[in-house]
C-alpha cells in the first residue's frame, strides 16, 4: 500500500498508429515528444500536446528494435533488424542518415550524456561505439559469446554496461576498452540493462522473470526481485534513483521502491506482453508499449512530493574507493526527508541555532541516511542468503529421501 503522501499512477494518453508490436519508447528531453518503434518497420513521433498530429518515419526495411533521443533532443537514433542504424532529425520532414552498423540485428542504441558518442549492441555478439556526428566507427567490445540485447553508457560516459543471451551482464571501461567485470547471476538470457542515475548501481532484467541490482564498484548483488510471472523485457530508473519500473511478458508493469526494497504498484494496461517502458527525463511521466500495438503514457504521481524534496536536499556524496569509478550519491529516503521538511519549514527566528551547528546537524542527518541505506542493503543480502540456505536444505532433504537405506 502506498504512503499517504503518494498518489497512484494514472493513464494520461494512449496512442494508436503502429500496425504491429511496439518494441521501444523514449521521451525527448523536454517531454514534448515521445518516440516509439515497432515490428511494422516504422518509427512514430507522438506529440504530448493533445490534438497534435504524429509523425511516421519510414526508412528501415525491417522491424525497428530500439530508439533513443540525443541529450539535446535534436537527434533521434534507431536500430533495426535490417542491421542498420539511422540518425533522424525529429521533425515533419523525417530526414535521416543511415549506416550499416552490424552484421546482424541491431538490438540497442544509446547516446552518451555529452551527445558525442553512440553505443550499439547486436545479434552479431558485439557492442560498438560510434562518433555521433559523422557516424564514424570508433571501436568494438567483443567478449560476449551470444546475442547482445542491450548496451548503455554510464551517466558520466566513462563506463558501458551490456546484457546478453550468454546470461551475463558485462561492465566495460570506455577508455581502456577492457571488461571490468562480468555478472553471471542470471539464470537465463539477460534482456535489458541500465545504470542507476547516480552511476553507482546497475539493474538488469531477464528471461528468468527476475530483476537484479548490483553495485557497480564492489560488483556485489544488492537487490533481487522475482515479482513477475514471465520474462522481464525492459526496465527504467526514475531520475531520482528511488524507483524502478519494469515491463513484462505477463502483461504488467511493476513499480519498485528501491529505498524500501518492495513492490509499490502493479499496472494492468496492455493486452498481451508489455515489451518496453521508459520514464521521462523529469520522471513526471512514463511510457509503455506492448504487443497489442499500443503506446501508453502514464502520469507518475507517486513521486510528486518526494522527488521535489530530494532534488532540494541530498546528503554529501560518499566517495568511491577507486578513482576510476563514479562517486556514490545516495538519495534521501522519502520518510526521512519529510521529517526534515517539517523542521526546516518553521520561521528562522524560532530556531535559534548557529549556522555551523545547523550545517553539522544536516551533515549528521545525511550520514544517518547513508547508514539507513546500508542497513537496508544488508537486510536484502541476508534475506537472499536465507533463501539460498533454505533451498540447499530442501534439496538435501530430497536427496536423503531418495537415497535407499
Curated annotation (Swiss-Prot):
WD repeats lie at residues 17-56, 59-98, 101-140, 143-182, 185-224, 227-266, 269-308. Keywords: Cell projection, Cilium biogenesis/degradation, Coiled coil, Cytoplasm, Cytoskeleton, Repeat, WD repeat. It is found in: Cytoplasm, Cytoskeleton, Microtubule organizing center, Centrosome, Centriole; Cytoplasm, Cytoskeleton, Cilium basal body; Cytoplasm, Cytoskeleton, Spindle pole. The keyword Repeat applies. Its main location: cytoplasm. SUPFAM superfamilies: WD40 repeat-like. Residues 367-395 form a coiled coil. GO terms for cellular component: centriole; centrosome; ciliary basal body; cytoplasm; spindle pole. CDD domains: WD40 (cd00200). InterPro entries: G-protein_beta_WD-40_rep, WD40/YVTN_repeat-like_dom_sf, WD40_repeat_CS, WD40_repeat_dom_sf, WD40_rpt, WDR55_POC1. Plays an important role in centriole assembly and/or stability and ciliogenesis. Involved in early steps of centriole duplication, as well as in the later steps of centriole length control. Acts in concert with POC1B to ensure centriole integrity and proper mitotic spindle formation. Residues 341-352 have a biased composition (Polar residues). It comes from the Eukaryota. Widely expressed in embryonic and adult tissues. One of its GO terms (biological process) is growth plate cartilage chondrocyte development. Residues 313-352 are annotated as: Disordered. Interacts with POC1B. This is POC1 centriolar protein homolog A.
Amino acid at each position: 500500500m502506498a504512503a499517504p503522501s503518494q498518489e497512484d499512477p494514472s493513464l494520461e494518453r494512449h496512442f494508436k498508429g503502429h500496425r504491429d508490436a511496439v518494441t521501444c519508447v523514449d521521451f525527448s528531453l523536454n517531454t514534448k515528444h515521445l518516440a516509439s518503434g515497432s515490428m511494422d518497420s516504422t518509427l512514430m513521433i507522438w506529440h504530448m500536446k493533445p490534438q497534435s498530429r504524429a509523425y511516421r518515419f519510414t526508412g528501415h526495411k525491417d522491424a525497428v528494435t530500439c530508439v533513443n533521443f540525443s541529450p539535446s533532443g535534436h537527434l533521434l537514433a534507431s536500430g533495426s533488424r535490417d542491421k542498420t542504424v539511422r540518425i533522424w532529425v525529429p521533425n515533419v520532414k523525417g530526414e535521416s542518415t543511415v549506416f550499416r552498423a552490424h552484421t546482424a540485428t541491431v538490438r540497442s542504441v544509446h547516446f552518451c550524456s555529452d551527445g558525442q558518442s553512440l553505443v550499439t549492441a547486436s545479434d552479431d555478439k558485439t557492442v560498438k561505439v560510434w562518433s555521433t556526428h559523422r557516424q564514424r566507427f570508433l571501436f568494438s567490445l567483443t567478449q560476449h559469446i551470444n546475442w547482445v540485447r542491450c548496451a548503455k553508457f554510464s551517466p558520466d560516459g566513462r563506463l558501458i554496461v551490456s546484457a546478453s543471451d550468454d546470461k551475463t551482464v558485462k561492465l566495460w571501461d570506455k577508455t581502456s576498452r577492457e571488461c571490468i567485470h562480468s555478472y553471471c547471476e542470471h539464470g537465463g538470457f539477460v534482456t535489458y540493462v541500465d545504470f542507476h542515475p547516480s552511476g553507482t548501481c546497475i539493474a538488469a532484467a531477464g528471461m528468468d522473470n527476475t530483476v537484479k541490482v548490483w553495485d557497480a564498484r564492489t560488483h556485489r548483488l544488492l537487490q533481487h526481485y522475482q515479482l513477475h510471472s514471465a520474462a522481464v523485457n525492459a526496465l527504467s530508473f526514475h531520475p531520482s534513483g528511488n524507483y524502478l519500473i519494469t515491463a513484462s511478458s505477463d502483461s504488467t508493469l511493476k513499480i519498485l521502491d528501491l529505498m524500501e526494497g518492495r513492490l509499490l504498484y502493479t499496472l494492468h494496461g496492455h493486452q498481451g506482453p508489455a515489451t518496453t517502458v521508459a520514464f521521462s527525463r523529469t520522471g513526471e511521466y512514463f511510457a509503455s508499449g506492448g504487443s497489442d500495438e499500443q503506446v501508453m503514457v502514464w502520469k507518475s504521481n507517486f513521486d510528486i512530493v518526494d522527488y521535489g524534496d530530494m532534488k532540494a536536499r541530498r546528503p554529501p556524496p560518499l566517495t568511491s574507493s577507486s578513482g576510476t569509478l563514479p562517486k556514490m550519491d545516495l538519495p534521501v529516503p522519502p520518510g526521512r526527508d519529510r521529517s526534515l521538511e517539517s523542521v526546516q519549514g518553521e520561521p528562522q527566528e524560532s530556531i535559534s541555532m548557529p549556522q555551523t551547528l545547523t550545517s553539522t546537524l544536516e551533515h549528521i542527518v545525511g550520514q544517518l541516511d547513508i547508514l539507513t541505506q546500508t542497513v537496508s542493503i544488508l537486510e536484502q543480502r541476508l534475506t537472499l542468503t536465507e533463501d539460498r540456505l533454505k533451498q540447499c536444505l530442501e534439496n538435501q532433504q530430497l536427496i536423503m529421501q531418495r537415497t535407499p537405506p
